[in-house]
Amino acid sequence: MAIDWDALIAAAQRVRKRAYAPYSRFQVGAALLGKSGRIYVGCNVENASYGLTICAERNAVFSAVAEGEREFVALVVAGKDPQVFPCGACRQVLAEFCDDLPILIVGEDGTQTETSLCELLPHAFRFKENIHKVG
Ligand code: THU
């Protein structure tokens, strides 16, 4: 499938504006392309009990799974800084559903950084391959 990166960037930047981040003031948006061609978005949602905060990337994955999509083609993360890389927890959650995944990081200043899940999380922990297809 050809990846429409512009559409993913626009979706990530749009949802970033909906982020609920009154504590950090650090809004993040994520747009995840499913194998079906659908785009799933997520923003970070913070909480007064700080540890309950959920990142944009995990919200995008969970939204996709709730819609029945478990296979992914690309991810765009839009943040304030030039390089807002997914946190370790989000990398592990992505690895549950992706062997590898091209990831584009987009900063508010327009900086684009290409990376991939395997680059960010080599040797991810998994029980067995493709377990998400049966569960
Ligand atoms: N955050 C994300 O949503 N994604 C990332 O990749 C990094 C961090 C959020 C969590 C928290 O709401 C804020 O950014 C500051 O850490």
Question: Could you tell me what each predicted segment is?
Answer:
Residues 2-18, 67-135:
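C-terminal binding/interaction regions
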Residues 25-34:
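Short beta-strand scaffold segments in enzyme catalytic cores
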